[in-house]
């Protein structure tokens, strides 16, 4: 929609009149309004503002959401309502009224034009609303309609008349006509009234500049003729007064002729009454109106003195306003008529009123400058026409100086004046034109001087408690005095001597000289202790040196012939002031000054350091002649000592710092001394205890004497960088500032290149972090520095790397690497020695630093600029680092200490480096486009690397091993990018290399190709030939032969190239090899551990090819494996994993072999138990080494252990006993295996033990081994949060132990469970578990684990799978186990949990636990309990002949169990209600229907049932069984009554009256009826008399 929407014809003339603002205006006709807004429009007629605002919101919403233009009837109705709604007292109603108008304008577009005359008045008036939100809403309408300057101009011309008409109507309204006094408070009535008047006046003021003189004169005159208007100056509303004054001023400025007829009213309101009225908030506007009226009509002031008329207003000051009041007042006073006879006579009173106002408590202090300026201007005007009398000056000017110099209560009405005001005041004094005034001024200054001198003389002694305060006050007064003197003398001629009293400056100078003499005399008399006098002298020498230049005052202050005076000066508080005096005269009197300096320094140095430091600091802080300072050897030594103290780590005193700064800024120390200091500081940076942590000394030297460090900026720069890295953030920021300063002064790139070179060549704890070097190297590289300038030396890198390649590789690497047994072949070079490696503080060695740095640089450059030798070193470093990481080598390229946090951090860094290396390798491979076709001309980067690495893989050294490993990585990268090479060219190249043979020179190279290309060489003839030769050569080898090991290693790697059972060798040859292997195992002592491991691998890999071959070697192989497992118990942890893992894999492959031969099956069966025992004994091996190899071994071993048959575990009790101990193993895998076995075996073992316990009537208890585990409660305090999140093994062992305890509960009967519970209760074991549980899960801190957020379902709560738990994080595993254990605790030990809960003191824990229980556990346990009841009810044993089945009904919705026992077609029934907090809250048993027993007996059954449930660990089924037993017991022996043929009588009782003759039992009630009917007291059966009934029965009582 286009804004405005009005035609080009603009705003025409309209005949419609404005709507009434009165509340009694007739309501609009709503009959034509649409139905959807008729109700809101009716609500607008109501009085309540809330109702109105809601109605407006509803109408607004309807207009906005409607797709159709608004109906004309709505616009018409709104035009009638808008004027009154727009002035409502509620700001929200007013704002919404304008918002609604805007939406109507948008919707109606041009159709609104005819209604605008009715709307324009309240709309424009709304733009002047005091509330900003309301005004903003009204202005939004203006912005929409008047969206161009042309439209604005037309609008104001077209609607001037309507706006004037609206204003005239508004000004004639009254508070009673605008509001209904019956329903509106007086305050609200006045607020609306003033709001209407204020906006109408503001609108008129806005219109006045646009109305031409001949336009609407009647309307404007009519507005000013309104009687109401002239009463508004006395309004209580400041905004109304302000609007009135602004309107009058606007009339005077724009239409003065219209106002002239009302001049009498104007004079009355503005001049006569205005100053007398309260003008807070409107005073400035009143003054502006007075200025306007005075300019146009000065006669308005009448004959009375204007000062007298203004005095009431002036006396009140700005009344909380700004300094504009005084500015406007000054302008008004400047144009006031002064012709009245009493003008001068009223001046003193007027000035007094001004002073009172200026210094009143209500006057803002920031107004003082403008106020005093106005005051002085006023005095100047008053005195301009005549010479003021001395009395006038004494009363109205002189006190200003007195108050400024020495504030007192007597002159408090002159406070807050500043020197410019004092100067101006004295300029008003006609000193040279009037003798009386001159005499008065001289007397005033002499009095001021005498008073000040007396104050100095009478200053308090040092012993006085107010000594400091009084001295400072006098010092400040002296400073103010000579500030004034400085101002007085500044404008005088330079040659003027200021002698005599010819002019005012001379009088001031003469007085000041006397004052200085008094101050000097006071110092001499009182041993220089009154430092206020010294301060006065300093003020004179620094601010008015012309007064001191030609006097001998300075010589009196420093008497050269009085050494004692100098001793007194240096120890006095006057020293800083006097030193400043000396500094001021030094340029004019150098010889005298030098003599004084020497004496002062000698006196100061006699006090030594640090006592003399404050004295020397003062002396060197003023311009001290260099010759004096640098010639004094004692002073030089003193300042050097100060610098050394300043540089110390312990904070120096501020005085020492100030002394050092002064010594630099004033060149007190010679360059030679500073050079020595700088060199010493540069060396000590970074040395603990020798450097200032604030670096103030270094910063000071660098900023002022940077040339001092020119010989060693690199060393200093490096030291600072190192400090920056290891310091806290605050200190690091300071170091960075110093470092940046050096970098800026000496050139960044040049410094950094040298720093990088030196930092890469060395490594120590102070070395720069490698990431810092990388970051800055990249910045330098981007600035255009060649890459070669930034790279490390390949020779140095190679040398440093070789020192790590002299160690034999860790044997366990044969487990983790595809190189397998190749690690057994690498032997330490002859003559090599282990050296302590240099490392940085992150444990990185020099080659590690170089590798990280270079790899990061190479990631951002083209491969064409990369050097092949550095690439080769990166890949060699990477394969070595990968192996170090695999075995967690403590002293490898990175130091990997035992600390878990440090090890994890450094492991992550190694992995990041390896990832970068892999990416770089992929780039190298990708750049070798000719590889796929086999076109290998040796020119590509990859081929150059292959040739270089092949040249190094020519022996059995560790370097050859890692060169071949790097070669393997390169081959794999090439295959990954390009696939396997094919074609004759590649075969020719491959064959030409001649490496597929088993010689010491070719073994590693062959392994590199076999592992690098893997199955890609399966079709190679050269590989097949090598395989056949190796199989043949094995047959002729002996264990002790040097070539045996590398032949077997190479054979095993060849076997890995081919799929199982598809090797290119005859089975016969493989059988011979198998025989040879089993022959070697007959002499185990001749075999090295490496050969042992490789033999097991060989048999394992040959096995699929010879599975159908019969022979003794199967049993021999198994026996050898068992032998190895036993041998491992006495071997080193570095060696035994290498052969144990392949032996386990060999046994596992035998067990899982498809269609094995009978010999193998027989061997496996015969050794089954031995293997089970041996496997479990392997679990007991120590876990001193934790690395990837050991983890692989543990996982493999645990998988094998899990397959142990249950019968082996139950039949061999020793095995189970050993497993309990393994639950506390340091290996998670071993713990898992032990738990898995115990989890399976424990229920079976417990079943047998429980049977024995019940038969032999022993007390059952939890196994002692389990009790010892759950009694070893872990101390959580020794773990950090991060360590605890890693689920420490001792915490895991403890929790798994508890899981096994509950496993024992699971299969045990009630009696045994109770005995278990008693044993746990005795040692308080469960409490410790619960405390640990809720500490870990967050309940103790009030932040319980959110099971929903952590995706723990009901299934997780009910069950725990140890193997599945290891798939997530360790922290989640711990949380899951704890969550499940709490469930088991509630299920099996609710009584103990409840006891712990009731004793719990922590309210926070209790609250967290309550909500947790109610949300997650209670519903599950209630469901379990109801399921258990259902199962019990459905599995009840068939009742005996005289018994009935207990009928049980479960109501899950009500959480209730009902049980009934049928007796004579009725049911004795109870209800068991389960609370929401079950099982921590007890169930409630209610007796629903009593049958067969009296109330007392019945209640005892109900209580007994509840007691059984409560004390049977919450078992509802036990309670039901007890209830059934009680009923059956009560009915036992009771037969039907022979009279009624029922067991239970009508009064719900059993037969209890026996005939002594026939022994039959009868109901009492039945006998009674029988007696009544038969009229006999005889037995119904035997007819013999029964005399057993009591009197009550005979009376028909029938009760007990």
Swiss-Prot record:
A zinc finger (RING-type) spans 1537-1583. One of its GO terms (cellular component) is RQC complex. SMART domains: FANCL_C (SM01197), RING (SM00184), RINGv (SM00744). HEAT repeats lie at residues 31-65, 114-150, 161-202, 245-288, 291-344, 526-606, 853-904, 962-986, 1045-1083, 1289-1324, 1325-1369. Component of the ribosome quality control complex (RQC), composed of the E3 ubiquitin ligase RKR1/LTN1, RQC1 and RQC2, as well as CDC48 and its ubiquitin-binding cofactors associated with the 60S ribosomal subunits. Signal peptide: none annotated. It is found in: Nucleus; Cytoplasm, Cytosol. This is E3 ubiquitin-protein ligase listerin. InterPro entries: ARM-like, ARM-type_fold, LTN1/Rkr1, LTN1_E3_ligase_6th, Ltn1_N, LTN1_UBC, RING-CH-C4HC3_LTN1, TPR_Rkr-1. The keyword Repeat applies. E3 ubiquitin-protein ligase component of the ribosome quality control complex (RQC), a ribosome-associated complex that mediates ubiquitination and extraction of incompletely synthesized nascent chains for proteasomal degradation. Mediates ubiquitination of proteins derived from mRNAs lacking stop codons (non-stop proteins) and other translation arrest products induced by poly-lysine sequences and tandem rare codons. Ubiquitination leads to CDC48 recruitment for extraction and degradation of the incomplete translation product. May indirectly play a role in chromatin function and transcription. The VLRF1 domain mediates binding to the 60S ribosomal subunit. It catalyses: S-ubiquitinyl-[E2 ubiquitin-conjugating enzyme]-L-cysteine + [acceptor protein]-L-lysine = [E2 ubiquitin-conjugating enzyme]-L-cysteine + N(6)-ubiquitinyl-[acceptor protein]-L-lysine. Belongs to the LTN1 family. Its EC number is 2.3.2.27. The gene is rkr-1. It comes from the Eukaryota. Keywords: Cytoplasm, Metal-binding, Nucleus, Repeat, Transferase, Ubl conjugation pathway, Zinc, Zinc-finger. One of its GO terms (molecular function) is ribosomal large subunit binding. It is an enzyme of class 2 (transferase). PROSITE patterns: ZF_RING_2 (PS50089).
């Amino acid at each position: 929609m286009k804004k405005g929407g009005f035609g080009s014809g603009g705003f025409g003339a309209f005949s419609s009149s404005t709507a009434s603002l009165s509340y009694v205006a007739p309501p609009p006709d709503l009959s034509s309004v649409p139905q959807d807004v008729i109700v809101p429009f009716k609500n607008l007629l109501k009085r309540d503002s809330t109702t109105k605002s809601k109605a407006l919101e509803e109408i607004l919403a309807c207009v906005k959401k409607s797709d159709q233009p608004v109906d004309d009837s709505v616009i018409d109705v709104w035009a009638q309502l808008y004027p009154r709604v727009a002035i409502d007292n509620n700001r929200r109603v007013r704002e919404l009224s304008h918002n609604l108008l805007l939406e109507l304008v948008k919707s109606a577009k041009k159709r609104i034009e005819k209604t605008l005359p009715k709307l324009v008045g309240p709309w424009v008036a709304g733009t002047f609303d005091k509330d900003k939100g309301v005004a903003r809403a009204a202005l939004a309408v203006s912005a929409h309609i008047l969206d161009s300057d042309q439209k604005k101009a037309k609008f104001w011309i077209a609607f001037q008349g309507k706006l004037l008409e609206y204003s005239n109507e508004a000004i004639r309204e009254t508070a009673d006509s605008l509001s209904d006094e019956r329903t509106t408070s007086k305050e609200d009535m006045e607020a609306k009234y003033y709001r209407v008047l204020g906006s109408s006046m503001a609108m008129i003021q806005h219109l006045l500049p646009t109305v031409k003189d001949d336009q609407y004169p009647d309307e404007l005159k009519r507005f000013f003729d309104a009687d109401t208007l002239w009463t508004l100056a006395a309004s209580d509303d400041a905004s109304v007064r302000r609007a009135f004054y602004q309107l009058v001023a606007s009339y005077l400025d724009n239409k003065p002729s219209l106002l002239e007829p009302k001049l009498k009213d104007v004079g009355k309101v503005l001049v006569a009454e205005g100053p007398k009225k309260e003008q807070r908030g409107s005073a400035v506007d009143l003054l502006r109106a007075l200025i306007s009226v005075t300019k146009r009509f000065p006669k308005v002031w009448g004959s009375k003195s204007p000062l007298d008329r203004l005095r009431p207003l002036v006396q009140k000051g700005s009344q909380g306003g700004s300094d504009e009041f005084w500015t406007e007042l000054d302008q008004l006073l400047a144009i006031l008529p002064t012709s009245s006879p009493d003008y001068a006579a009223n001046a003193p009173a007027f000035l007094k009123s001004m002073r009172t106002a200026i210094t009143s408590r209500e006057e803002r202090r920031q107004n003082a400058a403008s106020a005093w300026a106005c005051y002085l201007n006023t005095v100047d005007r008053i005195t301009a026409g005549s010479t003021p009398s001395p009395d006038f000056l004494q009363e109205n000017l002189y006190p200003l100086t007195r108050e400024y110099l020495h504030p007192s209560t007597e002159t408090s009405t002159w406070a807050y004046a500043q020197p410019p005001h004092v100067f101006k005041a004295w300029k008003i004094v006609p000193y040279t034109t009037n003798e009386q005034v001159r005499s008065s001024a001289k007397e005033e200054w002499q009095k001021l001087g005498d008073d000040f001198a007396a104050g100095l003389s009478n200053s308090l002694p040092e012993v006085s408690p107010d000594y400091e305060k009084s001295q400072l006050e006098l010092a400040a007064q002296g400073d103010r005095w000579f500030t004034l003197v400085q101002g007085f003398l500044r404008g005088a001629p330079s040659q003027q001597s200021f002698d005599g009293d010819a002019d005012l400056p001379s009088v001031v100078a003469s007085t000041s000289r006397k004052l200085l003499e008094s101050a000097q005399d006071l110092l001499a008399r009182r041993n220089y202790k009154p430092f206020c006098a010294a301060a006065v002298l300093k003020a004179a020498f620094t601010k008015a040196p012309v007064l001191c230049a030609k006097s001998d005052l300075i010589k009196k202050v420093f008497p050269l012939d009085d050494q004692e005076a100098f001793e007194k000066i240096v120890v006095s508080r006057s020293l800083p002031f006097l030193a400043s005096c000396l500094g001021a005269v030094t340029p004019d009197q150098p010889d005298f000054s030098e003599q004084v300096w020497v004496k002062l320094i000698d006196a100061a140095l006699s006090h030594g350091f640090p006592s003399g430091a404050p004295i020397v600091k003062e002396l060197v802080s003023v311009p001290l002649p260099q010759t004096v300072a640098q010639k004094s050897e004692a002073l030089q030594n003193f300042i050097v000592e100060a610098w050394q103290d300043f540089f110390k780590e312990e904070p120096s005193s501020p005085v020492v710092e100030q002394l050092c700064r002064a010594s630099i800024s004033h060149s007190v120390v010679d360059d030679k001394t500073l050079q020595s200091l700088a060199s010493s500081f540069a060396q000590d940076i970074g040395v603990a205890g020798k450097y200032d942590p604030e670096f103030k000394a270094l910063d000071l030297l660098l900023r002022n004497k940077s040339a001092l460090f020119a010989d060693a900026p690199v060393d200093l720069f490096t030291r600072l960088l190192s400090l920056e890295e290891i310091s806290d953030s605050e200190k690091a920021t300071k170091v960075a500032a110093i470092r940046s300063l050096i970098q800026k002064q000496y050139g960044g790139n040049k410094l950094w290149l040298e720093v990088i070179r030196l930092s890469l060549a060395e490594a120590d704890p102070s070395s720069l972090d490698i990431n810092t070097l990388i970051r800055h190297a990249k910045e330098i590289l981007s600035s255009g520095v060649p890459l070669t300038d930034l790279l490390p030396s390949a020779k140095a890198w190679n040398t440093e790397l070789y020192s790590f390649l002299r160690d034999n590789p860790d044997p366990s690497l044969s487990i983790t690497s595809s190189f397998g047994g190749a690690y057994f072949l690498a032997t330490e070079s002859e003559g090599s020695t282990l050296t302590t490696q240099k490392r940085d503080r992150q444990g990185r060695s020099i080659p590690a630093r170089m590798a990280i740095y270079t790899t990061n640089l190479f990631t951002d450059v083209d491969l064409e600029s990369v050097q092949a030798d550095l690439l080769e070193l990166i890949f060699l470093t990477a394969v070595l680092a990968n192996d170090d990481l695999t075995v967690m080598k403590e002293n490898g390229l990175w130091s990997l200490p035992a600390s878990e946090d440090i090890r994890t951090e450094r492991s992550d860094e190694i992995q990041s480096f390896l990832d970068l290396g892999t990416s770089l390798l992929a780039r190298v491979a990708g750049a070798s486009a000719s590889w796929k076709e086999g076109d290998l001309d040796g020119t590509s980067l990859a081929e150059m690397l292959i040739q270089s690495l092949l040249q190094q893989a020519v022996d059995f050294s560790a370097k050859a091993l890692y060169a071949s490993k790097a070669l393997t990585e390169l081959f794999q990268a090439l295959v990954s990018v390009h696939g396997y090479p094919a074609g004759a060219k590649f075969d020719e190249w491959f064959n030409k290399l001649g490496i597929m043979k088993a010689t010491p020179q070719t073994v590693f190279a062959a392994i590199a190709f076999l592992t690098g290309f893997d199955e890609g060489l399966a079709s190679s003839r050269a590989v097949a030939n090598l395989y056949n030769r190796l199989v043949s050569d094995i047959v002729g080898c002996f264990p002790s032969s040097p070539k045996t090991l590398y032949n077997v290693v190479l054979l095993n790697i060849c076997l890995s190239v081919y799929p199982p059972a598809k090797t290119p060798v005859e089975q016969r040859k493989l059988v011979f090899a198998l025989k040879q292997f089993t022959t070697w195992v007959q002499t185990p002592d001749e075999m090295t551990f490496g050969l042992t491991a490789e033999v097991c691998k060989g048999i394992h890999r040959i096995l699929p090819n010879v599975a159908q071959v019969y022979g003794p070697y199967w049993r021999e192989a198994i026996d050898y494996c068992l032998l190895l497992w036993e041998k491992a118990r006495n071997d080193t942890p570095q060696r035994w994993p290498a052969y144990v893992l392949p032996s386990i894999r060999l046994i596992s492959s035998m067990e899982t072999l498809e269609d094995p031969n009978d010999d193998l099956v027989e061997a496996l069966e015969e050794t089954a138990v031995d293997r089970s025992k041996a496997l479990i004994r392997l679990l007991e091996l120590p876990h001193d080494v934790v690395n990837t190899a050991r983890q692989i071994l543990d996982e493999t071993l645990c998988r094998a252990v899990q397959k142990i048959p249950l019968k082996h575990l139950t039949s061999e009790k020793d095995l189970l006993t050993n497993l309990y101990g393994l639950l506390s193993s340091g290996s998670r895998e071993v713990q898992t295996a032990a738990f898995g076995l115990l989890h399976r075996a424990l229920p079976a073992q417990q079943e047998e033990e429980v049977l024995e316990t019940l038969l032999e009537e022993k007390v059952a208890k939890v196994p002692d081994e389990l009790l010892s585990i759950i009694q070893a409660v872990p101390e959580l305090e020794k773990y950090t949060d991060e360590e605890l999140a890693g689920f420490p093994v001792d915490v895991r062992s403890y929790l798994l132990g508890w899981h096994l305890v509950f496993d024992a509960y699971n299969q045990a009967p009630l009696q045994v469970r109770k005995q278990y519970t008693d044993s746990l209760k005795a040692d308080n074991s469960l409490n410790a578990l619960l405390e640990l549980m809720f500490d870990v899960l967050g309940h103790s801190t009030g932040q319980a684990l959110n099971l929903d957020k952590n995706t723990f379902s009901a299934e997780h709560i009910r069950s725990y799978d140890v193997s599945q738990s290891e798939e997530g994080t360790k922290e989640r595993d711990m949380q899951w186990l704890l969550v499940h254990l709490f469930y088991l605790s509630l299920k099996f030990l609710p009584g103990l949990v409840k006891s712990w809960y009731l004793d719990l003191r922590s309210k926070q824990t209790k609250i967290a636990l309550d909500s947790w229980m109610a949300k997650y556990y209670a519903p599950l346990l209630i469901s379990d309990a109801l399921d258990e009841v259902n199962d019990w009810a459905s599995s009840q044993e068939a009742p005996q002949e005289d018994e009935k089945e207990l009928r049980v009904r479960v109501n899950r919705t009500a959480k209730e169990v009902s049980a009934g026992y049928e007796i004579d077609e009725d049911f004795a029934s109870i209800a068991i209600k389960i609370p929401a907090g079950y099982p921590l809250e007890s169930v409630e048993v209610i007796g629903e229907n009593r049958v067969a027993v009296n109330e007392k007996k019945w209640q005892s059954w109900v209580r007994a049932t509840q007691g059984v449930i409560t004390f049977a660990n919450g078992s509802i089924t036990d309670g039901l069984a007890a209830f059934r037993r009680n009923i059956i017991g009560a009915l036992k022996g009771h037969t039907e009554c022979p009279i009624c043929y029922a067991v239970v009588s009508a009064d719900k009782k059993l037969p209890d009256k026996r005939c002594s003759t026939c022994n039959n039992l009868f109901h009492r009630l039945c006998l009674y009826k029988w007696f009544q009917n038969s009229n006999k007291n005889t037995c119904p059966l035997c007819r013999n008399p029964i005399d057993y009934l009591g009197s009550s029965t005979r009376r028909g009582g029938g009760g007990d």
